[in-house]
A protein has these predicted regions:
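Glycine-rich phosphate/ribose-binding loops and adjacent secondary-structure elements
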Residues: 3, 184, 188-345
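Ordered alpha/beta subdomains of enzyme catalytic regions
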Residues: 1-211, 237, 310-403
């Protein structure tokens, strides 16, 4: 195969995304047909999902859509970055975003708009579910970007961190978020030394003090034996131990962890924290959360399925219209507690809901091409998502509609 002549890797450049080159070809056909017919209708488009696990998710990617559409002839309303959105079995959905634009101009940007929202939201939603499964007292670290396309690593880690993980391992993502990367040591380091104790002692000698001494304890011997060896090698400098045993040979992980905790404690190692990684999902986390201090979660979150958002016209030149199976007209979403009501925008019902304590979820993002929303810092987003998830986990939730 011949080399690419303008890039090293099979990835889109930022300017190519902005120009709509990552679109599907039938949108180019559509644009050409509209230009031929001298048509460019003003449309309202809504982005929504119908089927999401447990009927809720975290919407993320709003910031990137704003950067994509900034300066264009568009008006955009959207939920807040990190907001919880709801779905139901009803055909009446709640949009997470609403775009008013000339269709010939916006059509080729459907792919990147959906891509930004679907990918980030899918990862954030999975990370939020894992956070809820773990509870507030257990640490969660993201270790999964090695199995994702490297160009996507910052997006993946941002979504995971905002959704409630305590740290991420990817270096570039950490730099972009202005946080310290977190990590332990790989099996490869221990194999390179050929002796666990030599590797642990070298790690302790080489690493600056702010790097926690977490010994990997399942490379060559039984986990209990290596845990005792690590404590003997590093003593009070040993912050924690990590078990990364594959599920194919780990046995009953809870019993292994409890055995290690006992053996460390009777040797004055009660200070040593226990971390588990390797093939973890919500079920395993629930089973272990009361006996471990933290989890390293990889592929189950970094390779999360995207949210299946749709991008549908609901109004053309001010006239409500929609394809079969969708519902026409610009909509507003109002929330009180986590009971959401969908209605037509600018209607008497909308005004009634606002007057009776319901919060509008679709807010101005772009007005006449200008971004009018001030985006929050990543740390503030994390705090907001944490607060919302805590409230949500204790509340009933529903979606209904009213006209």
């Amino acid at each position: 195969m011949n080399d690419l002549n303008d890039r090293r890797f099979w990835i889109a450049k930022e300017e190519e995304i902005m120009q709509g080159k990552t679109t599907d070809v039938y949108f180019l056909y559509t644009k050409q047909v509209l230009e031929y017919a001298k048509m460019n209708p003003r449309v309202t488009i809504e982005v929504f999902a119908r089927h999401v696990k447990d009927n809720w998710g975290i919407v993320l990617g709003i910031y990137e859509v704003a950067k994509l559409l900034e300066g264009k002839d568009v008006n955009v309303k959207a939920m807040d970055e990190g907001e919880i959105f709801l779905t139901s079995q009803s055909p009446i959905y709640e949009p997470v975003m609403q775009i008013e634009a000339n269709y010939a101009d916006i059509a080729i940007l459907e792919n990147p708009i959906l891509g930004f929202l679907c990918s980030s939201s899918g990862i954030a939603s999975k990370a939020a579910r894992i956070r809820l499964a773990a509870g507030d007292k257990v640490l969660l670290f993201s270790f999964g970007t090695r199995r994702a396309h490297p160009a996507l690593a910052p997006m993946i880690e941002r979504a995971i961190y905002i959704a409630g993980f305590d740290g991420v391992s990817n270096v570039l993502a950490s730099e972009l978020m202005h946080i310290d990367a977190v990590g332990t040591m790989p099996h490869a380091l221990i194999l390179a030394f050929g002796d666990q104790r030599d590797a642990w002692k070298a790690f302790d000698a080489a690493m600056p003090e702010y790097v926690k001494r977490i010994a990997l304890i399942d490379t060559l011997y039984d986990e209990k034996i290596e845990a005792i060896m690590a404590l003997e090698a590093l003593g009070k400098r040993l912050y924690g131990v990590r078990l990364d045993t594959p599920s194919s040979r780990r046995g009953n992980m809870r019993k292994i962890v409890e055995e290690i905790r006992w053996e460390l404690s009777i040797r004055d190692g009660g200070h040593v924290k226990i971390f588990v990684s390797g093939g973890l999902d919500e079920q395993e986390i629930v089973e272990l959360r009361d006996v471990v201090d933290g989890f390293g979660v990889g592929t189950s979150v970094s390779a999360s399925p995207p949210i299946d958002f749709s991008f549908k016209i609901v109004e053309v030149n001010g006239r409500p219209i929609a394809k079969r199976g969708d519902v026409a007209g610009r909509k507003s979403v109002y929330r009180r507690g986590f009971n959401d009501i969908v209605t037509l925008a600018d209607s008497k019902v909308a005004r009634y809901l606002e007057e009776h304590g319901y919060e509008p979820l679709l807010k101005d993002l772009i007005v006449d091409g200008k971004v009018v929303r001030e985006f929050k810092s990543i740390e503030q987003l994390r705090l907001d998502v944490k607060k919302r998830l805590n409230e949500f986990s204790k509340a009933e939730h529903s979606v209904s509609w009213m006209l």
